[in-house]
Amino acid sequence: MEGGGGGADGQAQPVAQAPPAMQPMQQLSRYESQKRRDWNTFLQYLKNHRPPLTLARCSGAHVIEFLKYLDQFGKTKVHASGCAYYGQPSPPAPCPCPLRQAWGSLDALIGRLRAAYEESGHAPESNPFAARAVRIYLREVRDAQAKARGIPYEKKKRKRTQQQQPPPPPPPPPQHQPGAAAGEASSSSSAAAAAVAAEGSGSSAAAAAATSQTGGGGGGSTTTTTASAAAPTTATRV
């Protein structure tokens, strides 16, 4: 009988599916890795807090409490006001002043926790890391450490991108003034006229010299006649 048997041929064999390929884990940047560690540290702090504290009830005062708690793990020497090395950036000898968290480290930590709080789905308006009390506390820590360590903290100014201006045009070539050109032309004309006059006087002198020589050879009458002819006749006949 066909169809009566329930053997292996009549049953649908399940298709063996290949296991899903494991997607390579995206490597986090150094900032993202540090932000995740800081966030886990803060959540662990809330868990160990006495009395117990939830993230929803956390305020700016609790954040300041957390920052003071981290001071015990600090590595920055902050001199007390009565220390002999107060205000010296490089003390010559060790002192019993406590180690604290540096202001720069705390400021960067708050920035990462503020971003992690909002990335976890919480509203920015309820962000305890952005509270005004936290900003005031960080400012006080900065000023106190600057005086105690003798290292002023200067806020870095962002460099503004300056618009590239075209280079200035080259200076125009020097132009001759009309008066100067006229003066040069007149001086050139005067020089030319003086040269012509000099040539004329030279020719006259040469002619006179030649006449004198001719007269000397034939007798004194020629010289006298030439001189008389050359001199103007101003006398009037009576």
From Swiss-Prot:
Keyword check for DNA-binding, yes or no. Answer: yes
Where is this gene product found? Answer: Nucleus
Task: State the superkingdom.
Answer: Eukaryota
- What segments bear the compositional bias annotation Low complexity? 10-27, 177-213, 222-238
The alphabetical list of record keywords is: Developmental protein, DNA-binding, Nucleus, Transcription, Transcription regulation
Q: Name one GO cellular component term.
A: nucleus
The reply on keyword DNA-binding is yes
Gene Ontology biological process: mRNA transcription; post-embryonic plant morphogenesis; response to light stimulus
Q: What is its main location?
A: nucleus
Name the chain's protein: Protein G1-like8
What organism does this protein naturally occur in?
A: Oryza sativa subsp. japonica (Rice)
Q: What does this protein do?
A: Probable transcription regulator that acts as a developmental regulator by promoting cell growth in response to light.
Q: Where is the composition biased (Pro residues)?
A: 165-176
User: Which stretch carries the motif Nuclear localization signal?
Assistant: 155-159
Its gene? G1L8
PANTHER family to which the protein is assigned, alphabetical: PROTEIN G1-LIKE2, PROTEIN G1-LIKE8
* PROSITE patterns in alphabetical order: ALOG
Q: Please state which protein family the record places this protein in.
A: Belongs to the plant homeotic and developmental regulators ALOG protein family.
Domain ALOG residue range list: 30-157
**What are the leading ranks of the lineage?**
Eukaryota, Viridiplantae, Streptophyta, Embryophyta, Tracheophyta
Checking InterPro entries in the record gives: ALOG, ALOG_dom
Please give the residue ranges the record annotates as the region Disordered: 1-33, 147-238
Q: What Gene Ontology molecular function terms does this protein carry?
A: DNA binding
